[in-house]
Structures are given as C-alpha cells and as structure tokens.
Amino acid sequence: MKFYKYCASGNDFVITNADRKEDRSALAKELCNRYEGIGADGFIVILPHEKYDFEWEFYNNDGSRAAMCGNGSRAAAHFAHHINKINPNMSFLTGAGVIKAKVNQDKVEVSLGKIKSVQNTFEELGKTWQLCNTGVPHLVHFCQNLDEFDTMLCQKMRQKYNANVNFVKILDENHLKVRTYERGVEDETLACGTGMGACFYLAFLNKKVQNKVKITPKSGEEVGFAYKNEELFFEGKVKYCFEANYNFS
C-alpha cells in the first residue's frame, strides 16, 4: 500500500487513496502504532465522490472512527491538491458534514462550519467546564496556568463525557494557548484543530477575545482562527513529510 505522511500543527497523519469504503479500523491501528507501524495520530483514507471533490474516512490512533479532525482536514486538503491535483478551492465530505478548504502552497484554510452545539458551564473536579461541539465534542476549561493540565484528570473527564478535554489560557484578546487530551489517542497531543476551535469559539462567545485570533498549541506551531458569517475558519501550515510503501503484517 502506498501511503503519504503529513504533519499539521503538531498532529501527524498517514494518508492514502482508495476506491471503495470498507472497515479499516484494524489497518488504522496497525499503521498508527509508533513502535510497530508508521506512527501517527490518525489515518485518513481519500475516496472518490460524485458530488464533492472527495470523501474521507478518518480513523483515530486507536482504530476508532471520528467524524471530524481539524488538522486532519487541512492535511487532507493539502494532499488532495498537491498529490491528487484537485483544484485548490475544494469541498469534501466528512462524518461531520461538508468541509470547504483553500490551499495556498503550504498554507491551508478550512471552514469548520457552524458550531454544532454549546452547553452551559458546570463545575466538576474543582474546575469550571463548558462543552462545545465543533464536529466532535470538546470539554473546555479556562485557566491562568497551563501547568494545571493533568492527564489523569483529563482521562476521568474524557471517560465520563466521551469528549476531548482542553485547557486554555487567554494571553490577550488576540492570542490563546491551548493544551488538549484527545479522545482516540487517549493522551495529550501536540495540537488539536477542533479543540482549538472550541476554545476560541467559547472565548469569543464570552467576549474574552476578538473574532480573529492566533492560537499556540503544545507544538508551538501557531495557527489562526476566525469567526465570520457564523462559520469557524482555521488556517495554518501543512507539511508533507514523505511517501513510501507499507507491507502489511
């Protein structure tokens, strides 16, 4: 199987083309294994579609399916344009709906669409939380010190609410820093696009930031978010790493 390795804002992905849908959960788990496979946060399968430029199947590191992945969507768009020669202005189908993307060399902007849902704040484990769905569910906690991030606490919240868990610090009205515990990876990752989007949207909703901000995830690779016309936009660099053939075990 020919595959392509991509990185976006600290998340890494294995991407391949296929001509039909099928359950690739076991394959995803094998490929994403960092010791016995290629190693990645997620596995993306690009499929043909009659109406849109393409459709994807997205698998988490543990082989589970996910409706959406922000950084994965940017990597998929970069791949579709640079490898599959699709128009730089494209739309593709995900489990969370249609994603629009614009590719400009190594920069990719995607529209994550309208926010699916926001719930009221609540207190648990000594912290204030709010749940926001940006294609997948995210718990968000605003803090003064990101060293408060606790993997064990995040694990408890993730298991109880079946959601990703984010800690966010507001540096000023134009800049946030975020750390994320990702469902499906079951650990902190270097970045999470939909998680950063949830943090930005809740900060904007609570009038703590402007409608356009920079966000720095754990990777240190700064990305941009904007909210306009009731849609969430996400832009940053994407890196093509390498391509190779994989022999199945």
Swiss-Prot record:
Main location: cytoplasm
Cross-referenced Pfam families: DAP_epimerase
Site (Could be important to modulate the pK values of the two catalytic cysteine residues): 138, 182
Catalytic activity line of the entry: (2S,6S)-2,6-diaminopimelate = meso-2,6-diaminopimelate
Xref: InterPro entries: DAP_epimerase_AS, DAP_epimerase_DapF
GO BP term, pick one: lysine biosynthetic process via diaminopimelate
Subcellular location: Cytoplasm
Any one GO molecular function term: diaminopimelate epimerase activity
Enzyme Commission number(s) of this protein: 5.1.1.7
Active site: 69, 192
Pathway the protein acts in: Amino-acid biosynthesis; L-lysine biosynthesis via DAP pathway; DL-2,6-diaminopimelate from LL-2,6-diaminopimelate: step 1/1
Transmembrane feature ranges: none
Gene Ontology cellular component list: cytosol
Residues binding substrate, per UniProt: 11, 60, 70-71, 164, 182-183, 193-194
Keywords assigned: Amino-acid biosynthesis, Cytoplasm, Isomerase, Lysine biosynthesis
PANTHER family: DIAMINOPIMELATE EPIMERASE, DIAMINOPIMELATE EPIMERASE, CHLOROPLASTIC
Quaternary structure, from the entry: Homodimer.
Purpose: Catalyzes the stereoinversion of LL-2,6-diaminopimelate (L,L-DAP) to meso-diaminopimelate (meso-DAP), a precursor of L-lysine and an essential component of the bacterial peptidoglycan.
Family note: Belongs to the diaminopimelate epimerase family.
The name this protein goes by in its record: Diaminopimelate epimerase
Species assigned in the record: Campylobacter jejuni subsp. jejuni serotype O:23/36 (strain 81-176)
UniProt lineage: Bacteria, Pseudomonadati, Campylobacterota, Epsilonproteobacteria, Campylobacterales
